[in-house]
Amino acid sequence: MAGAMRKMAVYLGLVEDDGYDGRGFDPDDDFEPELDPEPERDHRRHEPAHQSHGAHQSQRDEEVRVVQPPAQREPMPRAASLAAESSRPARIAPVASITQERASLEKSAPVIMPKVVSEREPYRITTLHPRTYNEARTIGEHFREGTPVIMNLTEMDDTDAKRLVDFAAGLVFGLHGSIERVTQKVFLLSPANVDVTAEDKARIAEGGFFNQS
């Protein structure tokens, strides 16, 4: 710095210095003053900026970093999955109370009573030979009393015989009995509480009209 000021003073003629008159010195030469070195505080002032820039750069690098997704597991083949399932212990279903279910079934099941076959009650068959339709009342009275009636219509004309058959059909229907044709004009009327045996029916068909006591 002092050398530069002296050069400037010599150049202006304020100071004489023979050393500058020698060869190689020209007062007309341009020169620049020497600059003092940059103070250290300037470096310290710029250091935080560099450090901040480095921090931002590292943060930017971390943001740009690509995160690879985890590798997906390949699906297990069906045969392998079935083998794995078969190797697992089977779940045991809870055992319900059989006694309780049986008791409930016994309560809900219908009770079937054994059929009791009673002994055949004795019956008496009455044979009637009506000649007119007016005798239908007599047939109805015997049948209502629970007596089987053999109705022989051979002595009646066809018109009255047909009317009497219609009456007998309505009679047995109303009292829940039955009517059977033995021959063309002979009919057996059986009440609901009487079961005429097959043997007696055969005898009636053979012409054995009788009053059985």
Swiss-Prot record:
What is this protein's name? Answer: Cell division protein SepF 2
Give GO cellular component annotations, separated by semicolons: cytoplasm
Species: Streptomyces coelicolor (strain ATCC BAA-471 / A3(2) / M145)
Kindly report the protein's main subcellular placement as a broad class: cytoplasm
Q: Which domain of life is it from?
A: Bacteria
Q: Where is the composition biased (Acidic residues)?
A: 27-39
* Protein's UniProt keywords contain Cell cycle: yes
InterPro entries attached here?
Cell_div_SepF, Cell_div_SepF/SepF-rel, SepF-like_sf
Per UniProt, subcellular location reads as: Cytoplasm
Instruction: Describe the subunit structure.
Output: Homodimer. Interacts with FtsZ.
- Alphabetized Pfam families for the sequence: SepF (PF04472)
The answer, when asked if NADP is one of the entry's keywords, is: no
Similarity annotation: Belongs to the SepF family.
Q: Which UniProt keywords apply?
A: Cell cycle, Cell division, Cytoplasm, Septation
Q: What does this protein do?
A: Cell division protein that is part of the divisome complex and is recruited early to the Z-ring. Probably stimulates Z-ring formation, perhaps through the cross-linking of FtsZ protofilaments. Its function overlaps with FtsA.
Q: Name one GO biological process term.
A: FtsZ-dependent cytokinesis
Q: Where is this region: Disordered?
A: 16-89
